Amino acid sequence: MADWSAEQYLKFEDERTRPARDLLAQIPRLEARQIADIGCGPGNSTELLARRWPQAKIIGIDTSADMLRQARERLPDATFIEANVAHWVPPAGTDILFANAIFQWVPDHLTQFKRLAEGLPEGGVLAVQMPDNLDQPSHALMRQVAQLPQFRKQLAHAAEARAALPHPSVYYDALRPLGRALDIWHTVYHHALDDAAAIVEWVKGTGLRPFLDPLDFPERKEFLEAYTARIAEAYPPRIDGKVLLRFPRFFIVLTR
């Protein structure tokens, strides 16, 4: 895929940061000396970590140069590096591995969770949040439009960019032997957005990217028109004119 756009991502910064706050709130109290923010994006989650542990050394990793540029501007005292978590090894002594909305993009991420957790010291924490929304209209309609004759060839593999998450019991059975405590849960957010176009703008920064990147400009325009029309039907206005974007997310907090 093309590079991520920090500007597009930050159009809904408050809504995107709320799950990071909720994940952070469930991390046990500990004196963290070194923290890694995996998939740090533009630094909004890294900023939360820096506020809670101002004495800690914090490193953020991401694959997007644009996201990292924004993160460095936001937090000049933190360290940000371009790296793929599938091949990245945390620095020795890392106490907390924090990952907000990144591992849903990582193939076989459960294997990565095990690898990362096994490297944590006693009392260290792996904290993860992943969207679990592929069955929601916002994403099902992407796949539906991709099957239209004019897009079918170019987007034959677009849906493969993300796989559905396994059942929570799969994560529990795999991770419970690796720590003294494991907390897993779902939270469903209902984001009140201005209209159907706002939902489209939201997913343009994330979920729509595998469907838009392979298309040229006229094709993207046609895809977005077809998708927006379907979104408007799936998310009717509420009493105040806004629409409710239902957004399930899955959380994991493992303590070694």
Swiss-Prot record:
Its EC number is 2.1.1.144. CDD domains: AdoMet_MTases (cd02440). GO terms for molecular function: trans-aconitate 2-methyltransferase activity. Its main location: cytoplasm. It comes from the Bacteria. InterPro entries: Methyltransf_25, SAM-dependent_MTases_sf, Trans-aconitate_MeTrfase, Trans_acon_MeTrfase_C. The keyword Transferase applies. Gene3D superfamilies: S-adenosyl-L-methionine-dependent methyltransferases, Vaccinia Virus protein VP39. Keywords: Cytoplasm, Methyltransferase, S-adenosyl-L-methionine, Transferase. The keyword Membrane does not apply. It catalyses: trans-aconitate + S-adenosyl-L-methionine = (E)-3-(methoxycarbonyl)pent-2-enedioate + S-adenosyl-L-homocysteine. GO terms for biological process: methylation. It holds the Pfam family Methyltransf_25. It is an enzyme of class 2 (transferase). GO terms for cellular component: cytoplasm. It is found in: Cytoplasm. Catalyzes the S-adenosylmethionine monomethyl esterification of trans-aconitate. Belongs to the methyltransferase superfamily. Tam family. This is Trans-aconitate 2-methyltransferase. It comes from Afipia carboxidovorans (strain ATCC 49405 / DSM 1227 / KCTC 32145 / OM5) (Oligotropha carboxidovorans).
